Amino acid sequence: MYYNMQVHSAYDLLNSTIKYESLFSKLIKDNQKSVVIVDPNMYGAIKAHKEAKKSGVNLIQGLEVSLGYGIGLLKFNILCKSEKMFYKLLEISTKFMNEEEWTVENFANEVIDYKDDFVLIIVDELRDSMEFSYLNNLI
């Protein structure tokens, strides 16, 4: 069984035009039982939850994160394993929108108390990088 681990929705304006209604209809049609939505914000999270519940598809909420590291960015997805983490992601997403730049240290300080409630998904080219090792050690 195939599960898409990185769906972006229309709430990620520059990366997707997928609306939740059509997404969940397509998932049902294709007999997919789960989906992971990882937009760079949580604007559509409640609507996605309602559509998932209505359709019977298991939704894993996530957030695409870009952190300043040196002169570059460290990008990864953080996925919720609990309702507690879902609310923390809502809070983090709001803080991202209100502050200029987040660092690896800022992010680690925000999530350190929740380390059993989330999963980090790192893109392959970063898996062995110094940046990922640094983030992993902080958390």
Question: Predicted regions span which residues?
Answer:
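Phosphodiester-processing cores and adjacent nucleic acid-binding clamps
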Residues: 1-139
